[in-house]
Amino acid sequence: MERLVKGDIVTLNFPFSDLSGFKKRPALVVSTLRGDDVILCQITTKDARSDEYAIDLSNDNFIEGKLPRNDCLIRVNRLFTGDKQIILKKSGKIKKQKLDEVREKLKEIISN
């Protein structure tokens, strides 16, 4: 797999919050750590607009690649640290402005 950086959109088997299983879904790379770990935010196509931490994501927000659907949400409060080996493929990269929006929302979550 090619080198991953902040802002990359990847596809992986994302675990359920209760760790009872997983589902193949896209995620946003928010940090790459030493070794083979990355920190990711879940991306969903389900209606999570009631989630105050969700950020709209459309194909207009990409500088390369795209998602199969154009009405997605980045679930900034759904973080996951995983080994790069679980990543199935790189799907694209979001624009700096959208990544900055995610960073600001992460700061808001952490500072509360």
Predicted stretch roles:
Residues 20-23, 29-61:
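Compact nucleic-acid interaction/catalytic patches
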Residues 63-112:
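C-terminal terminal-subdomain/extension
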Residues 15-19:
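Short, charged beta-turn/beta-strand-edge "cap" motif at the junction between a beta-strand
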